[in-house]
Amino acid sequence: MRQGIHPEYHHDTVVKCACGNTFTTGSVKPELKVEICSKCHPFFTGKQKIVDVGGRVDKFNKRFNLNK
């Protein structure tokens, strides 16, 4: 490997989630902020989050006159 071109690796990077969970990992950044982690992700918690896309569907149907 060439010297001087690789970023500094931090073995104790703190990852902070929006839900309040924190954990450490390795990264080239000293601190990471994430919106979702294994403590709050629906796949790991078993809870479903419903994403509201009804407005987009209605807008599409209205634009192309697909109302029945």
From Swiss-Prot:
| Pfam families named in the record | Ribosomal_L31
For this protein, the record's SUPFAM superfamilies field holds:
L28p-like
Q: Which InterPro entries match?
A: Ribosomal_bL28/bL31-like_sf, Ribosomal_bL31, Ribosomal_bL31_A, Ribosomal_bL31_sf
An MF annotation (GO) of this entry: metal ion binding
A GO CC term assigned to this protein in UniProt: ribosome
- Cofactor binding remark: Binds 1 zinc ion per subunit.
Q: Which cofactor does it need?
A: Zn(2+)
The highest taxon in the source lineage is Bacteria
UniProt keywords, alphabetically: Metal-binding, Ribonucleoprotein, Ribosomal protein, RNA-binding, rRNA-binding, Zinc
Query: What's a single GO BP term from this record?
Result: translation
| Ligand binding (Zn(2+)) | 17, 19, 37, 40
| PANTHER family given in the database record | 50S RIBOSOMAL PROTEIN L31, CHLOROPLASTIC (PTHR33280), LARGE RIBOSOMAL SUBUNIT PROTEIN BL31C (PTHR33280:SF1)
Quaternary structure annotation from Swiss-Prot or TrEMBL: Part of the 50S ribosomal subunit.
Which family is this sequence assigned to?
Belongs to the bacterial ribosomal protein bL31 family. Type A subfamily.
* Function in brief: Binds the 23S rRNA.
Record protein name field: Large ribosomal subunit protein bL31
Q: Which organism is it from?
A: Clostridium perfringens (strain 13 / Type A)
